[in-house]
Amino acid sequence: MIDELLAADVLVFGIPMYNFSVPAVFKAYIDQIARVGRTFTSSYEGLVKGKKAFVVTARGGGGYGPGEPRETVNFEDPYVKSVLGFIGITDVTFLHINNTARGEEVQASLNQVRTQIKEAASVS
């Protein structure tokens, strides 16, 4: 897994929000790639440099962003940003698909994310 990570120029992670955080399978992936001497040094310097990461999240509700009502229970974004930063990936863009459990409301969120993806693709 580490070799695949190191070989990639761009990383795309699809992560649903489970109980305000990441699913166990994503945590297990992080546990496999966070290795001293491979992705960080013994003095805790990240070794995975020069990579761009896109993190696409799916959430049943909304309001988890800065200044929103459920910001304080969003443990997903800070965790992902911190752990990727720890191994040296600091160029991270989050794309949030919100309200997946709310029928028609999800469409607006999907449209917003599609626009963000198109904008990101035109910059790259």
Question: Where does each model-flagged region fall?
Answer:
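Helix-loop-strand module that forms the ligand-binding subsite of alpha/beta enzymes
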Residues: 2-73, 78
